[in-house]
Amino acid sequence: MERNTRKTLQGKVTSARGDKTIIVEVESHRSHALYSKRYRVAKKFAVHDENNIAKVNDIVTIMETRPLSKTKHFRLVAVKQAAMQGEK
């Protein structure tokens, strides 16, 4: 699979405890089939962070890749926005 055709997502880092692994929450909105109300859906992905550069509350871009472990199928592409100091 070529790199430019791989799925890229943007989300917020919720955990950076593991070595070279971060947990990223990706938010999307769906529309209810019958009532057409939009609602929020969030999904968490385990992401490979080779250099341990991402911190909690950073906004990051991730890209789909080959399976790196049982749960990791994404890798970190870039940190879009660093978290503010003191932010929880």
Swiss-Prot record:
The keyword Cell membrane does not apply. One of its GO terms (molecular function) is structural constituent of ribosome. Pfam families: Ribosomal_S17. Signal peptide: none annotated. Disulfide bonds: none annotated. Gene3D superfamilies: Nucleic acid-binding proteins. One of its GO terms (cellular component) is cytosolic small ribosomal subunit. Coiled coil: none annotated. InterPro entries: NA-bd_OB-fold, Ribosomal_uS17, Ribosomal_uS17_bact/chlr. The keyword Nucleus does not apply. GO terms for biological process: translation. Keywords: Ribonucleoprotein, Ribosomal protein, RNA-binding, rRNA-binding. It comes from the Bacteria. One of the primary rRNA binding proteins, it binds specifically to the 5'-end of 16S ribosomal RNA. Part of the 30S ribosomal subunit. Belongs to the universal ribosomal protein uS17 family. NCBIfam families: PRK05610.1, uS17_bact. This is Small ribosomal subunit protein uS17. The lineage of its organism: Bacteria, Bacillati, Mycoplasmatota, Mycoplasmoidales, Metamycoplasmataceae.
